[in-house]
A protein has these predicted regions:
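Register position in tetratricopeptide repeats
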Residues: 29, 63-64, 97-98, 131-132, ...
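Helix-start (N-cap) detector for alpha-helical repeat units in TPR-like alpha-solenoids
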Residues: 14-18, 51-52, 85-86, 119-120, ...
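Structural marker of alpha-solenoid helical repeat scaffolds
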Residues: 9-12, 46, 80, 114, ...
Length: 232
């Protein structure tokens, strides 16, 4: 191809690195991930210390679920730019996926030092504290987040999950009730409610909640076992 000929002609030309990087982005938009990876890697062969190009490739690795390769690129970015928001955020995400919770917490803390009050980092801290069973700290952060973002349904659902984990089922139901008012077509809310009702032995209410979830789009086979159990 013409671009490979350009590389052979002037292998060290910086413009070639940019050319490959841009080509990789175009290929990625077209869904040609394998070709895009090759282009990003060619760009990085020419400019191995380019933060932008490392982030581009890391992001694509992450999309393709190549966590270990994405991790290496994000680490290299942080070595070059210790305060890079994107790299800190996504390396923390990778740590969470690997269940390396203390490492994730360290990155979220660093991110909050770089961007005080960053919403993603605050949510990350709440979730990582939950995973570390530091429930009080997790709940306090979720409480602050919900005060700051009262219409964010995902936060209400996340706090409800924490309340279920700590056996505060009535509080969880209150949060899910608030979430349902904000997002009446969110089927997952009704599945969560149904599970809590089952835990409480309120089978009839559980059945109604599961049926509502089916009505809102969850395939019936996915909830078949729950529907059957709640009919007993």
């Amino acid at each position: 191809a013409w671009f490979k000929k350009a590389l052979q002609k002037e292998p060290a030309n910086m413009r070639n690195a940019l050319l490959f990087s841009n080509l990789g982005t175009i290929q990625r938009r077209m869904g040609k991930n394998k070709e895009a990876l090759e282009s990003y890697s060619l760009a990085l062969n020419l400019t191995p210390y380019s933060v932008t190009m490392l982030l581009n490739r890391a992001s694509l690795y992450l999309d393709m679920d190549y966590l270990d390769k994405a991790y290496v690129d994000y680490c290299n970015v942080i070595d070059l730019d210790a305060k890079n928001q994107e790299a800190l955020q996504f390396r923390a995400y990778i740590y969470m996926r690997r269940r390396e919770y203390q490492e994730a917490k360290n990155d979220y803390q660093r991110l909050l030092e770089v961007v005080p009050g960053d919403k993603t980092a605050r949510i990350g801290m709440a979730m990582v504290n939950q995973k570390l069973q530091r429930y009080r700290e997790s709940l306090e952060e979720f409480n602050r987040l919900i005060v700051d973002y009262p219409k964010d349904v995902s936060l209400l659902k996340a706090r409800a999950e924490l309340e279920v984990e700590t056996n505060n089922l009535e509080l969880a139901l209150l949060d899910l009730e608030s979430a349902a008012k904000l997002a009446p077509n969110d089927a997952e809310i009704y599945v969560m409610c149904g599970d809590i009702y089952m835990e409480q032995g309120r089978n009839r209410e559980a059945y109604v909640a599961f049926e509502k979830a089916v009505e809102l789009g969850i395939p019936r086979p996915e909830l078949q076992d729950r529907l059957k159990a709640s009919k007993k």
